[in-house]
Design a protein with these regions (language model features):
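Conserved AMP-binding/adenylate-forming core of the ANL superfamily
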Residues: 21-22, 39-84, 88-92, 109-114
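Conserved ATP/PPi-binding loop(s) of AMP-dependent carboxylate-activating enzymes
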Residues: 368-372, 383-417, 455-457
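Conserved adenylate-forming
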Residues: 69-71, 183-195, 199-242, 262
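Gly/Ser/Thr-rich phosphate-binding loop
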Residues: 286-291, 300-362, 374, 384
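Conserved AMP-binding/adenylation subdomain of ANL enzymes
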Residues: 220-239, 247-288, 302
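AMP-binding/adenylate-forming catalytic core of the ANL superfamily
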Residues: 108, 115, 125-130, 399, ...
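Structural core segment of the AMP-binding/adenylate-forming
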Residues: 68-69, 96-177, 499
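Flexible, low-complexity linker/hinge segments
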Residues: 15-24, 156, 161-196
């Protein structure tokens, strides 16, 4: 790929300009909106709306409360909750204090929660009431953890509308008690935009989770980059129905972007509760929706999804996992044509570094680099040689959206962030290629690319073809070392059969026949495993780490 950035020609045609580096904090935007558009709706949760004035006032109360608990600039606050109001209030409060947040997945086991609390040196944790036994149980272990604040799903509801049990235990502080009597005024601390705002842990699907340190500058700049590239993100009004959990970097950036552009953010505690999601979208129809392919498929399987008013929908974003053509076709029939936008990102890149410009979609591609970012394809072996157009290699990205490094892992930081031609590049570990216009096409994770007889087998390509079979609900390709041919892999296929084919005794033979007809011999799986369910991560990605353990 030439280093001339061919996508800039398209950006010139569309009038897309780089936002440069935006040196502001999330809290500064919230405070502006609370002052200038105080009555505008900011949050929607289980039928209740919060104006920007209330959003800012409650965040001020929480900032005062956290300061009373000893939280100071640079201290780490753990956010161990689903998508409830306290999470976004905490983000704003942390930004005001100059503290650091870290999202802790609600589905982690106690030992995993403890490991993250220790690794990030968490001082105070806000924990969901249903999860509080986990954090209370580890509070007495010497980790530096000083307080556990219990956040209930009903703290901001006049009447319970979502059945989520609460738990109040010893050695903890109730959120409502903490907030009682606090002032809704707060003088935000002077915060260096280069300082760390969030420590976001990688999913750990290919190894132990690492804490990516993201500055105020990187997260805010990335929100501007993505919005500048896809103009639909800037169109008012903005009503975002995001299915990403806030502890995930995509959910985090959705919340930050919506706040920056004075939009309304739907807080959905459990996006897998399709009935509740659809009910909320009917109450306040979305202009933007964001989800992984697996969730779109779950939603479309429920008749209620088809009853949502999508007439104002501008864009349906998808990412974090490959999306099949059959899913795209089905979604188009429900939401309307030319609204789906694929993209590509990762925690370490703030997270978005490739999106489709508005109305310039290219089939099979995930888009172009966001405005102000650079992208190259380099050889996997050395990471130094730029690959020609159309030839796959490792995807690397550069720009002001990149992380500052991995917390406490200098070796991993040096391996990921490398200097090349006078720039710092993030080596993503993903394999792809670009065409002559600079559009990026994904092939696979470098770790998921198999070698069979000297040929490269991209698991995503094989999985996508197999998902066209009516008998297959979901599948995953896993490579294992070929003992007979060192340096080669055996292609293993894990299959979750569709409901109507669960008892088909001829399922494996049908799959083999399909493969022989639709792909080269070296790509055909040598071992087929029929399992009850393909494991998924918290955000709906196929959990290949779990499958590898089962091999």
């Amino acid at each position: 790929m030439p280093t001339s950035q061919p996508w800039l020609k398209i950006y010139d045609e569309l009038g897309i300009k780089s936002p440069g580096t935006v040196s502001r904090t999330m809290a500064s935007f919230l405070e502006d909106h609370a002052k200038n558009s105080s009555d505008a709706d900011a949050l929607h949760y289980c039928g209740k709306s919060f104006s920007y004035a209330i959003y800012n006032g409650e965040a001020n109360k929480l900032a005062n409360a956290l300061r009373d608990e000893g939280v100071r600039k640079g201290d780490v606050v753990g956010l161990h909750m689903p998508n409830i109001p306290q999470y976004v209030l905490a983000l704003a409060a942390i930004s005001k204090l100059g503290a650091i947040g870290t999202g802790i997945s609600p589905i982690l086991a106690p030992g995993e929660v403890l490991a993250q609390i220790k690794d990030a040196n968490v001082k105070v944790v806000l924990s969901f009431s249903e999860l509080t036994p986990v954090t209370v149980a580890i509070k007495d272990i010497p980790t530096g953890l000083k307080a556990v604040i219990i956040c209930g799903p009903r703290d901001y509801l006049d009447a319970p509308q979502v059945e989520l049990p609460e738990y109040i235990g010893p050695a903890s502080i109730r959120f409502t008690d903490l907030m009682d009597g606090q002032s809704d005024q707060f003088q935000s601390e002077p915060v260096d935009p280069e300082s760390i705002f969030m420590i976001q842990y990688t999913g750990g699907t290919t190894g132990p989770p690492k804490g990516a340190m993201l500055s105020h500058r990187s997260l805010v700049t990335n929100a501007f980059q993505a919005s500048a590239t896809h103009e639909a993100l800037l169109e008012r009004p903005i009503v975002l129905g995001s299915a990403f959990p806030l502890f995930h970097v995509a959910g985090l950036t959705n919340a930050i972007t919506t706040c920056i552009y004075k939009g309304l953010y739907h807080l959905i505690p459990d996006p897998r509760n399709v009935s509740h999601y659809c009910e909320m979208m009917k109450l306040v129809p979305p202009t933007h929706i964001v989800a992984v392919p697996a969730l779109y498929e779950m939603w479309m399987a429920n008749p209620a999804f088809k009853e949502i008013d999508f007439s104002q929908l501008k864009v349906a974003h998808t990412g974090a996992a490959p999306v099949t053509q059959s899913t795209l076709n089905a979604l188009n029939t429900i939401i309307g044509e030319n609204k789906i936008a694929d993209g590509f990102g990762m925690t370490e890149a703030g997270p978005t570094h490739v999106v489709h410009p508005n109305m310039r979609y290219k089939k099979g591609s995930v888009g172009l680099p966001v405005a102000g970012a650079d992208l190259r394809i380099v050889d996997i072996e050395t990471g130094l040689k730029t690959m020609p157009v159309g030839e796959p290699g490792e995807i690397i990205t550069s720009g002001p959206h990149l992380m500052s490094g991995y917390l406490g892992r200098p070796k991993a930081t040096v391996e990921a962030l490398r200097e090349l031609d006078g720039k710092i590049w993030m080596y993503t570990g993903d394999v792809g290629y670009v065409d002559e216009e600079g559009y990026l096409f994904l092939c696979d994770r470098a770790k998921d690319m198999l070698i069979v007889g000297g040929y490269k087998v991209f698991s995503v390509e094989v999985e996508d073809k197999l998902c066209a079979m009516p008998a297959i609900a979901s599948c995953a390709i896993i490579g294992t070392p070929d003992e007979k041919r060192p340096g080669n892999d055996v292609v293993n296929l894990y299959v979750e059969l569709a409901q109507n084919f669960k008892n088909d005794p001829d399922a494996k033979n049908r799959i083999v026949a399909f493969c022989r007809e639709n792909m080269a011999a070296y790509k055909i799986p040598k071992a087929i495993h029929l399992i009850d369910e393909i494991p998924l991560t918290a955000v709906g990605k196929i959990d290949k780490k779990a499958l590898r353990k089962a091999v």
